[in-house]
Amino acid sequence: MRCPYCRHPDSRVVDSREADDGQLIRRRRSCPECGKRFTTVEEAVLAVVKRSGVTEPFSRTKIIGGVRKACQGRPVDDDSIALLAQKVEETVRAKGAAELPSHEVGLAILGPLRDLDEVAYLRFASVYRSFESLADFEREIETLRTAAQTRGGG
């Protein structure tokens, strides 16, 4: 790593630590030429391929925004939404792919959102799965009821 002070082409790693829930690695470095220290941050880039074929970086902020819209007017706090977004990011990063289709991000949102708030889940699913009729909603509600009964909640 090039020293930002003297431009020496090499440096020594003094310390490495994980940051941002393990998504980043912060390295403290020392330059053997001038002796100054500096910090670098490394992050594995995760790209999302949209339906149009356009690729963009994964954004936890976009997840939070979409889930927040689905939760509007519901008793769901910002901390719960942030935790859900973190779970989604961990799930998609665990797949080990550098790129993944936006469809997989949506699927990763549905499970945790269903556990968080069923009404918000229905709102999100209706957009994500392009519900076109009441029958689509009824089918999804029946699936939720069946799952609740299976878990012993109904």
Curated annotation (Swiss-Prot):
Signal peptide: none annotated. GO terms for biological process: negative regulation of DNA-templated transcription. It comes from the Bacteria. Keywords: ATP-binding, DNA-binding, Metal-binding, Nucleotide-binding, Repressor, Transcription, Transcription regulation, Zinc, Zinc-finger. Pfam families: ATP-cone, Zn_ribbon_NrdR. Residues 46-136 form the ATP-cone domain. Its cofactor is Zn(2+). GO terms for molecular function: ATP binding; DNA binding; zinc ion binding. Binds 1 zinc ion. A zinc finger (unnamed) spans 3-34. The keyword Metal-binding applies. Belongs to the NrdR family. PANTHER family: TRANSCRIPTIONAL REPRESSOR NRDR. Negatively regulates transcription of bacterial ribonucleotide reductase nrd genes and operons by binding to NrdR-boxes. This is Transcriptional repressor NrdR. It comes from Salinispora arenicola (strain CNS-205). The lineage of its organism: Bacteria, Bacillati, Actinomycetota, Actinomycetes, Micromonosporales.
